[in-house]
Structures are given as C-alpha cells and as structure tokens.
A protein has these predicted regions:
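Hydrophobic positions on the long internal alpha-helix
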Residues: 93, 119-123, 127
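Conserved glycine-rich Rossmann-like NAD(P)H-binding loop of the short-chain dehydrogenase/reductase
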Residues: 26-42
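Canonical Rossmann dinucleotide-binding motif of NAD(H)/NADP(H)-dependent dehydrogenases/reductases
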Residues: 1-31
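Conserved NAD(P)H cofactor-binding loop of Rossmann-fold oxidoreductase domains
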Residues: 95-100
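Rossmann-fold cofactor-recognition segment
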Residues: 49-69
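Catalytic Tyr-X3-Lys loop
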Residues: 103-118, 134
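The beta1-alpha1 cofactor-binding region of Rossmann-like NAD(H)/NADP(H)-dependent oxidoreductases
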Residues: 37-38, 62-76, 113
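Conserved hydrophobic beta-strands of the Rossmann-like cofactor-binding core
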Residues: 3-6, 88-93
C-alpha cells in the first residue's frame, strides 16, 4: 500500500485530490493533512459517508504548515503510526495554501513558500527511495 500525505486536504483541491486517489488508486493509503482538526475530521466523515470502505485507507493528520512545531509533531505522528516501516511514505502532495492578499505578504509566504519547505524538510526523510513529491 502506497501512503501519500496531502496537505490542505480538508477542502477544495486537496479534498478532491484525496477523493480521486481513493477512487482511482486502490493501492493507496491517504494521510489527510489539515490545519483545523475539526474540519479534517469532517472531511474524513464526508469521504467515508460517500464510500464506507475508504475508512481503512484514510487517516487525518493535524498539520499547520506555517508552524515548525506543528510540522515536526506531524512527522513524528506519521513515524509512530507506521513504526513498522522505516520509510512509511510513498508521496507528499504539498497542497496547503492561502490566497488572500488582505492578510498581508508574510502569512502568505509562511504557508505558500515556507510551508512547502517545512513539509519537505520534515517528511522527505520518511519517503521510500522511489517516492514522489508534488
């Protein structure tokens, strides 16, 4: 089973990506990354209501890509959840992002630029040799 982390997966493109992978790639296990745990759990519920058998192929992971601590804790959670595998991930899909210019440049950079860097720094060591990053 190929495990793939999708950040920003509780709505929009991220949620659609998770659903598409579940529908079209039965050999995948999706780690649904969400900054907001409640919305992440709601996304899991929505997916499992659509298709109950997906429940065995899903996990919600609390991760705020704008926070070093949150990303590092999330990486440790993945390691402990799949401790039988030294390299528990096949893929990382860096989807988390914000688009509002009204909040200013700094928060946008923290998520859209530095967030990708943080996630890659923390999770690339967990990738299989043939793993992929998007």
């Amino acid at each position: 089973m190929k495990r793939i982390l999708v950040t920003g997966a509780n709505k929009g493109i991220g949620l659609a990506t998770v659903e598409n992978l579940l529908q079209n790639h039965p050999d995948t296990f999706l780690i649904l990354g969400s900054r907001d745990e409640k919305r992440g759990e709601e996304a899991l519920e929505l997916l499992t209501l659509k298709e109950p058998k997906w429940a065995d192929r899903l996990m919600m992971l609390a991760i705020d890509v704008s926070s070093d601590d949150s990303v590092n804790i999330a990486a440790k959670t993945v390691v402990s959840s799949f401790e039988m595998d030294a390299k528990p991930l096949y893929g990382i899909i860096n989807n988390a992002g914000i688009g509002s210019s009204s909040i200013g440049l700094e928060p946008t950079l923290q998520v859209n630029t530095w967030g990708i860097h943080r996630v890659c720094e923390a999770f690339v060591p967990l990738l299989e040799a043939s793993g992929r990053i998007v």
